[in-house]
Structures are given as structure tokens and as C-alpha cells.
């Protein structure tokens, strides 16, 4: 399938420019993927919506030990340390799903939170926003790029095989910038 033409981590010989936003959007539209409230997109890493995050019983059934809320302080997101208690580790990121919102300052802290959590045996991480399509997906893509050494294209394909995602254009631009920084593209 599409994976055959995508180089595996460490196989890329030289830095390549990030695909255009339109090409990335086509990649995001390709194929079929789940539209569930929550999906496991990487081992023990889930993307979900606010309804799932606000349902402590559902989180317990899933075995979620860590929650990253990409819509912290938002109208529909109740989460926080007081809401989850001591049974769940929580990180809130006050991102707005707007193309001009700069989410990139949160890439590193979000990716590090996910990475640290996934090194704990038995840990499971839920990354959510309101719908689980743009903000949360953006932070998961950044994690896959920063800690799993996937290119942006590889990260999108990996997540899209398991969940329908569609980061807004501003977030895609910021992910492209991260991809270029990580791959050394665009430097003289």
C-alpha cells in the first residue's frame, strides 16, 4: 500500500522538503479510518474526544494512566488534576483550533510527556481535544516525529491507518517546519 514508498525511520539518505499543505491534506483524506470517539494510534497511545476524556469510567475501562488535554481550559473539557485525582497523570495545553494559533511551542513538552508516560510499564496515554481531530492529532504527530523519528508524512500515514484526523492548515504548516528542522531541510 502507501507504506511501500515511504522510507522507514533512519532510511532517509538526505533531507527532503516537506510536502505542500495541499499534498498533506490529500494524504489526510486518503483511505478510510475510524471515526470512533477514541482510537489507539500507536501502541498504548490513544487519540480521543472530550466526551471520552470526561468519562472517568471509560478511561478506567481503557486503562488510561495519562491524559494530555490539548484544549485545556476550553468550554467542553473538564479535565485537570482535580477532575482525575491521583489515578491519572495530567498535562493541559491551552491550544485553540485556529490556523493562526502557534501550537509549536507545545510540541516538545507534549512529546516529552507522552514519551515519559510510554516508558512506564502498563501506561496508556489519551491525547484529546474537543473532537480528537486537529489539536490532539497535531501533538501526537509531533511526538511521532520527535521521539519515534518518523517524518511528517510517515506520522500522518501511521495515525491515519487507525483514526481519521485533519489538523488545520496552520498546524500543518507548523508540523512542516518541525519536519524540516528535524531533517535539516532548508538550511544552507
UniProtKB/Swiss-Prot annotation:
Record's subcellular location: Cytoplasm
Substrates-to-products reaction catalysed:
O-phospho-L-tyrosyl-[protein] + H2O = L-tyrosyl-[protein] + phosphate; O-phospho-L-seryl-[protein] + H2O = L-seryl-[protein] + phosphate; O-phospho-L-threonyl-[protein] + H2O = L-threonyl-[protein] + phosphate
Q: What class of enzyme is it?
A: hydrolase
**Primary site of residence:** cytoplasm
Q: Where is the Tyrosine-protein phosphatase domain?
A: 37-184
Q: Which residues form a coiled coil?
A: none
Highest taxon of the source? Eukaryota
GO cellular-component term (any):
cytoplasm
Q: Which GO terms describe its molecular function?
A: protein serine/threonine phosphatase activity; protein tyrosine phosphatase activity; protein tyrosine/serine/threonine phosphatase activity
Which CDD domains does this one have? DUSP13A
Residues forming the catalytic site: 129
Q: What is its EC number?
A: 3.1.3.16, 3.1.3.48
SUPFAM superfamilies tied to this protein: (Phosphotyrosine protein) phosphatases II
UniProt keywords (A-Z) are: Cytoplasm, Hydrolase, Protein phosphatase
Q: In which tissues is it expressed?
A: Skeletal muscle-specific.
- Note the InterPro entries from the entry: Atypical_DUSP_subfamA, Dual-sp_phosphatase_cat-dom, Prot-tyrosine_phosphatase-like, Tyr_Pase_AS, Tyr_Pase_cat, Tyr_Pase_dom, TYR_PHOSPHATASE_DUAL_dom
Describe its partners and assembly state.
Answer: Monomer. Interacts with MAP3K5/ASK1; may compete with AKT1 preventing MAP3K5/ASK1 phosphorylation by AKT1.
What functional role does this protein have? Probable protein tyrosine phosphatase. Has phosphatase activity with synthetic substrates. Has a phosphatase activity-independent regulatory role in MAP3K5/ASK1-mediated apoptosis, preventing MAP3K5/ASK1 inhibition by AKT1. Shows no phosphatase activity on MAPK1/ERK2, MAPK8/JNK, MAPK14/p38 and MAP3K5/ASK1.
Q: Which family does it belong to?
A: Belongs to the protein-tyrosine phosphatase family. Non-receptor class dual specificity subfamily.
- Descriptive protein name: Dual specificity protein phosphatase 13A
